Amino acid sequence: MDKKIVIPGDLLSENQKKAGYGTYVKNDKIYSSLCGIENLKEDKVGVIPLAGAYIPSANDVVIGIVIVVTPSNWIFDIAAPYDGLLHVSEYPRRVESREMPEILNVGDSVILRVKDVDSSMKVELALRDPSLHKLKTGQIIKVESVKVPRVIGHGGSMISMLKKETNCSIFVGQNGRIWIDGKDEDIELLSKALRKIELEAQRSGLTDRIYNFLKNERIRQKESKPVGFFKNETEGVTATKEDHSEEIYRKIDVLLDPKN
């Protein structure tokens, strides 16, 4: 069964104590203030937006991409309407201005924490934590930031399953950028799963649906693999089973030829 989609003004609950994100209270009743998915929990009711830009908040952990290097700051694209600023003092060690492009240069991807967002939407970033670092391998997939909770799942159920079933390393930024790393075929499989999660975020039982999807895709991957090859006597050349058999028969014919 699909989850209920609501629009602004829809009645969600008559219990004022349960008002959550994406709601407003009027006459002791809770209404939706967004177009999104009704999110009912024991202690509150809220709305998960169907779409919308990422709006940074303090303590968010995001994946940023360096777009400018100045003598004292790195400026990052954080997949938001506003760029993020990492001051050199927020780097884990002392850095001279001339070193900055060598440490983080334009195009580099980094896991960062949002330190502060002021009233003018100036976004300050931080890197002073062992879990925050430059990403040197893997690739980045972008999903809508409002779909991030579905990628993670209740209690981390979805992301734990994705890691186990694809054998990939995964980090989900709150800005919708997801870093993945692993073997090529595993990355391809995980990328498909993430796209499916994004498209079907409003569906119930999504973790089970994605689990079954991954199992079926694994079967297809195995069935599509080519038949094994035998190595030929010539270095760097491979031969099929049929070629290998023909070579053996040719050698036997030579041995049995009365002229030899």
UniProtKB/Swiss-Prot annotation:
Keyword Cytoplasm: yes
SMART domains: KH, S1
Database matches in NCBIfam families: PRK04163.1-1
Source species: Methanosarcina acetivorans (strain ATCC 35395 / DSM 2834 / JCM 12185 / C2A)
Function of the protein: Non-catalytic component of the exosome, which is a complex involved in RNA degradation. Increases the RNA binding and the efficiency of RNA degradation. Confers strong poly(A) specificity to the exosome.
UniProt-recorded Gene Ontology molecular function terms: poly(A) binding; RNA binding
Pfam families: ECR1_N_2 (PF22625), KH_6 (PF15985), S1 (PF00575)
Record keywords, A-Z: Cytoplasm, Exosome, RNA-binding
Domain KH residues, every copy: 136-194
SUPFAM superfamilies associated with the record: Eukaryotic type KH-domain (KH-domain type I) (SSF54791), Nucleic acid-binding proteins (SSF50249), Ribosomal L27 protein-like (SSF110324)
GO biological process: CUT catabolic process; exonucleolytic trimming to generate mature 3'-end of 5.8S rRNA from tricistronic rRNA transcript (SSU-rRNA, 5.8S rRNA, LSU-rRNA); poly(A)-dependent snoRNA 3'-end processing; RNA catabolic process; U4 snRNA 3'-end processing
Similarity comment text for this entry: Belongs to the RRP4 family.
UniProt subunit comment: Component of the archaeal exosome complex. Forms a trimer of Rrp4 and/or Csl4 subunits. The trimer associates with a hexameric ring-like arrangement composed of 3 Rrp41-Rrp42 heterodimers.
Keyword RNA-binding set for record: yes
Protein name (record): Exosome complex component Rrp4
Compartmental location: Cytoplasm
Disulfide-linked positions: none
GO CC annotation terms, alphabetical: cytoplasm; exosome (RNase complex)
Transmembrane segments: none
Domain S1 motif: 59-128
